[in-house]
Amino acid sequence: MLESEGRLMTRRMAIVVLAATMGVPAFAALKTHDTAPDFSAKASLAGEEFQFSLKSALQKGPVVVYFYPSAFTAGCNIEAHTFSENKEKFDAAGASIIGVSRDSITRLNAFSADPQYCAGKIAVASDPEGTIATSYGLTKMAVRAGMKDSRGVEIDHDFTERTTFVVTPDGKIADVFSTADDKVSPADHVVKSLAAVQALAGHKPSQP
């Protein structure tokens, strides 16, 4: 009898725990003051492939790590263009920028060189399996079947939610903002990240 009651109690406790956790996302994006996971990935700058290392980039100053859904799509085009237009201001604050998406390196070679978007100024890294995004607690969004990019080319990869992390040289996250949680527009990801790196450098924030 006591054994049966014990099993019943165990089942009830399991149900309570399950009910308490239902609806909680499998991942939660990293927050301010968390340690930014190090990563290395194939990347492209001005159409040229190279191996990007966050650890190496941080030795030179803060790094803006911005995740975006896909190259050659409306919001991502705006974001890349705005970053490229303000690259000199990030340079003045001693900060570098790396975009990360699930695009193939072939797509990113074209995107990084396109004068309308990255304009040869912004490096973008390929995260085809979403490994980097997952380490930052970001969720995958399935691409709609037959969806095409702004060039009319079918998109063959899933998306990562648009989220930006500002990482300090000691590997800590100084700021983070997302379109999903904070309703930040693609262009405002640039505005906010620029203000964050200028604050780290002790500069007066400027308007992109």
Predicted features and spans:
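N-terminal export leaders
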Residues: 9-15
